[in-house]
Amino acid sequence: MTTLKEMYEKEIVPGLKETFGYKNPMEVPKLDKIVLNIGLGEAINNVKLLDSAVEDLALIAGQRPVITKAKKSIAAFKLREGMPIGCMVTLRREKMYDFLLKLINITLPRVRDFRGISGKAFDGHGNYSLGIKEHIIFPEIDFDQTDSIKGLNVSIVTTAKTDKEGKELLKQFGMPFKN
């Protein structure tokens, strides 16, 4: 099986050049990075939740996450500036393509009642954001070892200038859009 990077260079670039009329292959949109983020508001009271989230995200991404801290104090949430409230990982190059392949072919089909992902979650500049309600759909996570089910944000950043270009790029990679 070819990797997504090889597929991009051999099939997707010529297809997008034809579809959008690009003259230069460097104009064709490409994946820039994939950012995985787990935000845990409950980590204010229970620091062990954050430790388990860091371990789970490291298993999912294949690299160590960075702990994110609160930028501002919010009294209503009993939150102080600098408190740890989540973790994130930025994937680039080979790990990015490996993660996308795993997401499309293994993880998303494991979602209960899966009929495709929404095609409306683009930001206006060709970047796509996907919310995953249960992180246990990833094959690396052992359901019995997990203390709680966490949500996960996946942001796919592309060099596309418009949502139409970004959606077509992800569709060519095999992203299962329902609309």
From Swiss-Prot:
InterPro entries tied to this protein: Ribosomal_uL5 (IPR002132), Ribosomal_uL5_bac-type (IPR020930), Ribosomal_uL5_C (IPR031309), Ribosomal_uL5_CS (IPR020929), Ribosomal_uL5_dom_sf (IPR022803), Ribosomal_uL5_N (IPR031310)
Protein's UniProt keywords contain Nuclease: no
Domain of life: Bacteria
GO molecular function terms listed in the Swiss-Prot or TrEMBL record: rRNA binding; structural constituent of ribosome; tRNA binding
Keyword Glycosyltransferase: no
Cellular component terms per the entry's GO annotation: ribonucleoprotein complex; ribosome
GO biological process, one term: translation
Keyword list, A-Z: Ribonucleoprotein, Ribosomal protein, RNA-binding, rRNA-binding, tRNA-binding
NCBIfam families xref list: PRK00010.1 (NF000585)
Function description: This is one of the proteins that bind and probably mediate the attachment of the 5S RNA into the large ribosomal subunit, where it forms part of the central protuberance. In the 70S ribosome it contacts protein S13 of the 30S subunit (bridge B1b), connecting the 2 subunits; this bridge is implicated in subunit movement. Contacts the P site tRNA; the 5S rRNA and some of its associated proteins might help stabilize positioning of ribosome-bound tRNAs.
Subunit composition and interactions: Part of the 50S ribosomal subunit; part of the 5S rRNA/L5/L18/L25 subcomplex. Contacts the 5S rRNA and the P site tRNA. Forms a bridge to the 30S subunit in the 70S ribosome.
Family: Belongs to the universal ribosomal protein uL5 family.
Protein name: Large ribosomal subunit protein uL5
Source organism phylogeny: Bacteria, Pseudomonadati, Thermodesulfobacteriota, Desulfobacteria, Desulfobacterales
